[in-house]
Every structure is written in C-alpha cells, then in structure tokens.
Amino acid sequence: MTYLQESSRPAVTVPKLQAMRDAGEKIAMLTCYDASFSALLDRAGTDVLLIGDSLGNVLQGHTTTLPVSIDDIAYHTACVARAQPRALVVADLPFGTYGTPVDAFANAVKLMRAGAQMVKLEGGEWLADTIRFLVERSVPVCAHLGLTPQSVHAFGGFKVQGKTEAGAAQLLRDARAIEDAGAQLVVLEAVPTLVAAEVTHMLKIPTIGIGAGVDCSGQVLVLHDMLGVFPGKRPRFVKDFMQGQPNIQAAVEAYVSAVKDRSFPGPEHSF
C-alpha cells in the first residue's frame, strides 16, 4: 500500500497563499496528523495541512496542548509529509520550544527536516525578534494571535480575545508587529468578527480565521472537530461537516467548498 499522491494539482506554496489572498480566493486549512488523512485531505482540495499541537487533545487525550513535545510534532509532521501532499505542510512549535530565537530556530529545523514547509508559533509583539530571526534563516513563519491555547493558564481559560477597546488595539499592534517582522501568514483565533476584519484589511499577508468571522483570508478547523468525532464540548466556531455526507472525503470537500464560497463560517460560528 502506498500513500504517495498521483495528482496534477499544482503544489500550494507560501507565495501561492499570498497570490490567493491577493486574488480574493479563500484558503482552506485543516489539521492533519498522519499519512492516510494527508492523502485524503489533499485529494479533497485542502490548501494547507496543519500539524497542530491540538494533537495533544484529540490524539493524546490531554486537556491542554501544553504537554506536547517537539518530538511529537516532528513525528506527526513526518507522517503527513510522507504522503507527498500538494497542500502546504505547516507544523506547530509547541509550548516551551521558542523562548529564544536560537531555540526557535533549532526546533524549527527539526520540523522542516521532518517535512514542514512553514512553522507556526503563538504570540504577538514580543515574538517579533524571533520571527525575524527565523525568516532571515529561510524558515517561513505563520503567527497565531487572539486565543492562543498555549496561554490558557495566563488567560484563565479558553476565552474570546480582543473584545475590549484595549484588547482590540493590542491585537492590531501585534498583527502589525508580526507582519513587519516577516511573518507570511497569521491565524486569528476566537476574535470578534469586526476586529478580525480590521486586522485582515490592515495586513498585506493572509489571515486564517478560527472563530474569527468570514472576512479572514481563509479558515482552519481541527479535523476531529469538523468530522464530529471528538467527544469533548464543541466550540462555537465548529460545524460538523459529516452530517448528511456519505464519507469523510465528501465531508472534507463540503468544508473546502463552504470556505471557498464564504458560506462558512456563519454568524452562529463567530463572535
């Protein structure tokens, strides 16, 4: 059995994501952790595969993402990459692996050697020097703003960010700082729709929303959430795309289509 792809679909690259954003084409991202789903999600037209530290929740059974190690992410990145997807492969730098620019680079190298084409890390202004350090060394970077799950204890739980005037202003400063530092993509999680729209309008790089409204350049969901197989409480921003579908590939195709035609997320999935 082989998971290698026989696809004529052009590869999705970092410049391709920028071109999609500039052309107004929505970007569909999903988390992915193994070769089988890498092949399936790629066939269904997913643009970006994220090896997220969410694997700590949906695969390992932890209540937070904090226990996930760099070796965990590297292992699952290699699994995803072996299917040779045409989608862009992005891997999370987990908690405690990017405290300094040097640490961030060393751990990013591990992930890129495993098959990642971009790394994602959580934080705003304070990460600008680290992002710049990575980009100068040919590591493409996706930043993550808003509800950053690695900060769950600092936030006092999983809470919407940017609801106050001060919070929204800080989010805008963070977004500007990470773009100026060279980030090529940014995830906005659990951010009010109007604030996310303002960030998206302000930035030149693509924004990927999760609970951040329909105006972002694209959307991302945790695979297990959108398939309705994770037993925990469903976040407001999740839609079960398996409902009414004959198989998983059809469900993923429905998700990709809904992102592309802006029918997802709806107001009921936003803040």
Curated annotation (Swiss-Prot):
Name the coenzymes or cofactors required.
Answer: Mg(2+)
**Compartments it resides in:** Cytoplasm
Q: Which GO terms describe its biological process?
A: pantothenate biosynthetic process
Task: Give the cofactor note text.
Answer: Binds 1 Mg(2+) ion per subunit.
Residues binding Mg(2+): 53, 92, 122
The annotated pathway is: Cofactor biosynthesis; (R)-pantothenate biosynthesis; (R)-pantoate from 3-methyl-2-oxobutanoate: step 1/2
Q: Active site at which residues?
A: 189 (proton acceptor)
Q: What is its EC number?
A: 2.1.2.11
Q: Does the keyword Ribonucleoprotein feature in the UniProt annotation? A: no
Q: Which domain of life is it from?
A: Bacteria
Q: What residues does 3-methyl-2-oxobutanoate bind to?
A: 53-54, 92, 120
What Gene Ontology cellular component terms go with this record? cytoplasm
N-terminal signal peptide? none
Q: Which Gene3D superfamilies match?
A: Phosphoenolpyruvate-binding domains
For molecular function, the Gene Ontology terms on record are: 3-methyl-2-oxobutanoate hydroxymethyltransferase activity; magnesium ion binding
Catalytic activity, reaction form = 3-methyl-2-oxobutanoate + (6R)-5,10-methylene-5,6,7,8-tetrahydrofolate + H2O = 2-dehydropantoate + (6S)-5,6,7,8-tetrahydrofolate
UniProt key word Cytoplasm: yes
Give the EC class as a word. transferase
Q: Which keywords does the record carry?
A: Cytoplasm, Magnesium, Metal-binding, Pantothenate biosynthesis, Transferase
Q: What does this protein do?
A: Catalyzes the reversible reaction in which hydroxymethyl group from 5,10-methylenetetrahydrofolate is transferred onto alpha-ketoisovalerate to form ketopantoate.
Subunit note: Homodecamer; pentamer of dimers.
User: HAMAP family from the entry?
Assistant: PanB (MF_00156)
Family that this chain belongs to: Belongs to the PanB family.
Name of the protein in question:
3-methyl-2-oxobutanoate hydroxymethyltransferase 1
- Organism of this sequence: Burkholderia cenocepacia (strain HI2424)
